[in-house]
């Protein structure tokens, strides 16, 4: 419900987990969605997810809820978001963008985004994604890198 952008499809324990960013529209028609699983309507411009056994059957999708509120809920500017759920060394991490860079520049300019990463709690057997909080600090380093060896840019969060 309320699809806007930032779609991603993952597979967990044989089920399809579809994550997406919700729209700016009001939620007055929330009751018309029958497969909402007792969940409240998502907040405006938040990240939500749905689960299905058969992704090609539109009636098979079950709404599971919001897993990240709008960045404005965490002290950043209100705006749309894109996330990526990544499993690494047995843990899940949520990558997202925020306006932290824009705010720190204090130039009045807009549209500058920076990437953030926080740990996510995911139960693969039930396809439950816990609520994730965006932060300015992110996560601690997962392991140390050798400063005398060439390091690829994608290791910057390890």
Where are these regions (language model features)?
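Carbohydrate-active catalytic/glycan-binding domains of CAZyme proteins
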Residues: 1-158
């Amino acid at each position: 419900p309320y699809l806007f952008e930032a779609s991603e499809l993952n597979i967990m324990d044989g089920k399809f987990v579809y994550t997406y960013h919700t729209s700016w529209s009001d939620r007055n028609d929330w009751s018309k969605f029958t497969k909402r699983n007792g969940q409240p309507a998502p907040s405006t411009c938040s990240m939500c997810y749905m689960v299905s056994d058969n992704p090609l059957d539109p009636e098979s999708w079950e709404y599971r809820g919001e897993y990240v509120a709008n960045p404005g809920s965490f002290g950043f500017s209100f705006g749309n978001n894109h996330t990526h759920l990544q499993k690494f060394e047995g843990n899940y991490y949520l990558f997202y963008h925020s306006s932290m860079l824009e705010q720190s520049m204090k130039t009045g300019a807009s549209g500058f985004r920076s990437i953030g990463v926080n740990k996510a709690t995911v139960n693969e057997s039930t396809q439950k994604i816990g609520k994730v909080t965006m932060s300015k600090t992110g996560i601690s380093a997962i392991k140390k890198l050798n400063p005398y060896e060439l390091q690829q840019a994608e290791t910057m969060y390890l």
